[in-house]
Design a protein with these regions (language model features):
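Sec-dependent bacterial lipoprotein signal peptides
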Residues: 1-16
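Beta-strand-dominated extracellular/periplasmic modules and repeats
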Residues: 18-147
Length: 147
């Protein structure tokens, strides 16, 4: 019969590495969302890690969310857990407006936005300075470049 302490050691060793993203790949992320320089209250910032570097058999890195307060500030926390932080590396950034919120955000910042942010190896600040019509800003930049 196998001694019980051997079974406990096997279970502990089997659990090592199960939370690979816990050790060094998750960092504190805070930030602020402004629209035309004014804080945006009640929107949700989503930070979805680029999964292209996750190989077969590796854990998918968790998506993080943060809801803005009256000053537009947020603190990211992970999906399915009551733990703060976001995955280190390139993250797809989306801003969504929950039902019932009075915040006005251009659809360009939501859904399949093209906005990415690199989360560094230490605590990271993600400040999002939104404009009312990002398509107008892009047109202006294109026209200036053509001159």
């Amino acid at each position: 019969m196998m001694p019980r302490y051997c079974l406990a050691i096997v279970v502990m060793v089997a659990g090592v590495g199960c939370n690979q993203f816990e050790s060094g790949k998750i960092v504190e992320v805070t930030g602020r969302v402004t629209l035309e320089g004014r804080p945006v209250e009640g929107v949700v910032v989503q930070l979805e890690p680029d999964q292209s570097s996750v190989g077969p058999g590796k854990k998918v890195l968790p998506t993080a969310y943060g809801k803005t307060d009256a000053d537009g500030r947020f603190r990211a926390f992970r999906t399915g857990k009551n733990k703060f932080g976001a995955a280190v590396g390139l993250n797809h950034v989306r801003v969504t407006v929950p039902e019932g919120s009075s915040a006005k955000v251009h659809p360009r910042y939501m859904g399949d936005s093209t906005f990415w942010h690199e989360i560094g190896p230490g605590p990271t600040v993600v400040d999002l300075e939104l404009v009312a019509d990002p398509t107008a800003v892009r047109r202006q930049a294109s026209e200036s470049a053509a001159d």
